[in-house]
Amino acid sequence: MSIKFFLLVSRQGKVRLAKWFNTLSIKERAKIIRDVSSLVITRKPKMCNFVEYKGEKIVYRRYASLFFVCGIEQDDNELIILEVIHKFVECLDKYFGNVCELDLIFNFEKAYYVMEELLLAGELQESSKTNVLSAVLAGDAESEADAQQDSLQKLVGSVKKR
């Protein structure tokens, strides 16, 4: 099982998050985003969550106003990818507390961090939500401590200049 790309697309077609696990040119990425987002957005809610696209499978799931889209190889299991998408949404939900599109817009780096704790090179790295969230929260605490130390050093530096 190897995910080639992971996209979060709004109903209006705006990309909110894009993670690529294969090397592609910017033109190729833009074409894939354009094609896949228009393909997924236009589908009716009762339709299947799997679509074929240029020899690959597109697996998607809609949560509220966002489409979570994964591109996978033809022989990969779609149901496992749906579970990976669901696990990612659950982690985001726990981290942000009922995640919404605005959380992802204004805190996209945190969403990427959650994704990177969950997936590694397109493979599921950690299946435990607790472990993913504890790693993310530990990273938050560390960056907060660094920010406090930096502000303290700036304060001490400004006092010394006086």
UniProtKB/Swiss-Prot annotation:
Q: Which SUPFAM superfamilies match?
A: SNARE-like (SSF64356)
State where it is primarily located.
cytoplasm
| Keyword Cytoplasm included in the entry's annotation | yes
Where is this gene product found? Answer: Cytoplasm; Nucleus; Cytoplasmic vesicle, Clathrin-coated vesicle membrane; Endosome
Please tell me one Gene Ontology term that the record gives under cellular component.
nucleus
Q: Which UniProt keywords apply?
A: Cytoplasm, Cytoplasmic vesicle, Endosome, Golgi apparatus, Membrane, Nucleus, Protein transport, Transport
What role does it play? Component of the AP-1 complex which links clathrin to receptors in coated vesicles. Clathrin-associated protein complexes are believed to interact with the cytoplasmic tails of membrane proteins, leading to their selection and concentration.
Record-given protein name:
AP-1 complex subunit sigma-1
| Name of the coding gene | vas2
